Structures are given as structure tokens and as C-alpha cells.
């Protein structure tokens, strides 16, 4: 029962309904936030759990609104907040802010505005645009930066729009060391060359992953099956780890349901999903009370250096969250 929805909204509700009719216990693989909202609404009507490894829109935290949704990542409000912390460390006192008008972009915009206020950073110019906007439209917005003296530029948008944004950055010459660019998405291996050139030097948050026996086992299996070397600084690899953990999460919930001599139904599995507490490949997995969010997930801020000699995406860690205080620590200047 596998459906490839390409992170698009189109026909997502029908796709989820088709899976529900097959009497599945749970649905995994909700990645992008906008379609994940549709998935969560659709699955909740049938009491079917839906698990995400990448949809981090702030609104998806709401357990009352999305009672059958969970995610093995932290919400975007923490990601965006840490980007503002980094900008403050680099001396930013005013920024330009680009965001999409989908559910994720609007939620992220509220977070960025609140964090900027707390950091005494002035959002001088805001540019909003619809998800999947045309290259021409994004070009026109980025071109307006020429009329400003803003050197710190923020973007919160899904990956396809992030790629178009960096194409525009490259086109208009903003991929220069005097500019600091912060984006909420890590670009992937298949990103076009002109977008890669525009993205060199930008900062992006990603899930932090700690060494463990579970991770060692995953790496061994990953490398054997793919023929690739695990790269801890690659978004592709990190998301593969999170994707693996959503499978283990459902497995743990089913085992817990059986152990308690409960009937294995989607409702009982959902109740056990919320009680989960185990060591996954990406670290300890448990959930905040009254929320759909993973508890205490570490975050790293990465800097993109371009592609290396082997044609691989090259990111280096710049900062990470402290496991005790939750504050951002700069680890590489």
C-alpha cells in the first residue's frame, strides 16, 4: 500500500481515502506540511493514525485539532527561532523575510516575527508568495532586495520554492559573502546547479542525530542496501533516518498494544503511539503531553559549502542546541 504524492496537495485526500479503504492500521510518510494537514484531517475522520518524518508546520502541533497525527521531528517554530538566534549572533539588527502563504509558511511567519521581536531584530521588508509560485514571480520579489541595504535574508518555504528562491539569489548576485541567508529547508542532492550556486554559504536547521547502537545498525543496513556512505551532514541521509524511525514507532505501538492484551485496532494503536518512549536511530523518541510533537529533539544549524569533489552536497555544522538548556551553541565560526 504505497502511494507517491510528490509532496503535492492535488488529490491527496482521495489518496488517503484509498488507503483507508484497505483497512490499514496506520499511515506513514507524511513529509510536506501542506499536504500533511490534508492527510491529518482525512485520516482523523476514520480514526487512522498518520505519522510524519518531515512535516513541521506549527499548526500540526495541535492535538485537539489533529488527534490522529504524530511526528518524529520537532515543530518549525523551534527551527526558525534558532535561525534568528544565529542571526543575532552574527550581529543582525534588521532583516528581509520571505515566506510562503501555505499553512506552514504562515505559521513560520508568526514564529519568525515573534522571535525577531524578542531578539530586537527589525523585519524591515516582508515578501509573501503562494506555494509553488512561478520562477518569474520569485525572481521579481528577490530583485526588490536591490532597493534595500539589507544583508540578512530569511526564507521559510517548502523545498521546491526554496530551490526557486536560490535560483533568483544566484541570478541577481546575492550569493556574496556580504549577505547572510537563512532558510528553513536543507536543499537536496538533485538541486539544479544554478540553485546550488545561489545557496552556497546559506544556513539551515536540521535534526541533530547522536551516536548509538541503533544508529550503527541503521547505517550498516543503509550502506548495504544503497551502496552509499552515510553522511551525517546530508539532508537526504538525515531524513532517511527519521523515516526509518516512524516505521519503528508504529511497530513499537503495535507491540505495546498486544502486550497489554488490547485488540489491535487503529484507535488502540494511536493511544500507544502517544505513550511511546524508546531509542530510535535518531535518538530517544517520546512525545510532549497534549501535543503531536517529539520531545526534546536536538537541532543543528548547517552551513552549505556547495558540492564536493565527489559530487556530494557539502554541509558543515555551525551550531547545535544544548541538551540541557535547549539554547543554541555556536560550534564553528
Can you annotate each of these PLM segments?
Residues 1-333:
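Extracytosolic ligand-binding ectodomains
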Amino acid at each position: 500500500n504505497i502511494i507517491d504524492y510528490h509532496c503535492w496537495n492535488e488529490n491527496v485526500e482521495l489518496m488517503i481515502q484509498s488507503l483507508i479503504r484497505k483497512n490499514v492500521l496506520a499511515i506513514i510518510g507524511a513529509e510536506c506540511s501542506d499536504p500533511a494537514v490534508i492527510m491529518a484531517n482525512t485520516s482523523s475522520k476514520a480514526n487512522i493514525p498518520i505519522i510524519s518524518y518531515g512535516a513541521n508546520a506549527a499548526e500540526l502541533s495541535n492535538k485537539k485539532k489533529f488527534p490522529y497525527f504524530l511526528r518524529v521531528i520537532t515543530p518549525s517554530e523551534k527551527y526558525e527561532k534558532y535561525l534568528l538566534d544565529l542571526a543575532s549572533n552574527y550581529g543582525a539588527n534588521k532583516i528581509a523575510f520571505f515566506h510562503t502563504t501555505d499553512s506552514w509558511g504562515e505559521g513560520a511567519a508568526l514564529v519568525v516575527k515573534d522571535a525577531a521581536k524578542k531578539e530586537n531584530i527589525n523585519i524591515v521588508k516582508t515578501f509573501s508568495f503562494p506555494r509553488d509560485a512561478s520562477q518569474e514571480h520569485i525572481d521579481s520579489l528577490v530583485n526588490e532586495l536591490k532597493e534595500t541595504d539589507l544583508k540578512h535574508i530569511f526564507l521559510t518555504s517548502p523545498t521546491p520554492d526554496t530551490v526557486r528562491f536560490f535560483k533568483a539569489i544566484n541570478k541577481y548576485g546575492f550569493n556574496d559573502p556580504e549577505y547572510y541567508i537563512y532558510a528553513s529547508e536543507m536543499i537536496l542532492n538533485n538541486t539544479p546547479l544554478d540553485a546550488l550556486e545561489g545557496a552556497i554559504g546559506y544556513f539551515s536547521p536540521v535534526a541533530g542525530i547522536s551516536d548509538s547502537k541503533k544508529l550503527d545498525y541503521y547505517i550498516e543496513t543503509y550502506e548495504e542496501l544503497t551502496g552509499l556512505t552515510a553522511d551525517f551532514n546530508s539532508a537526504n541521509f538525515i531524513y532517511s533516518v527519521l523515516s526509518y524511525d516512524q516505521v519503528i514507532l508504529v511497530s513499537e505501538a503495535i507491540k505495546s498494544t498486544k502486550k497489554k492484551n488490547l485488540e489491535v485496532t487503529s484507535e488502540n494503536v494511536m493511544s500507544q503511539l502517544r505513550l511511546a518512549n524508546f531509542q530510535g536511530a535518531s535518538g530517544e523518541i517520546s512525545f510532549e503531553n497534549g501535543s503531536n510533537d517529539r520531545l526534546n529533539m536536538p537541532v543543528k544549524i548547517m552551513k552549505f559549502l556547495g558540492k564536493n569533489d565527489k559530487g556530494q552536497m557539502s554541509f558543515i555544522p555551525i551550531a547545535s542546541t544544548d541538551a540541557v538548556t535547549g539554547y543554541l551553541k555556536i560550534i564553528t565560526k
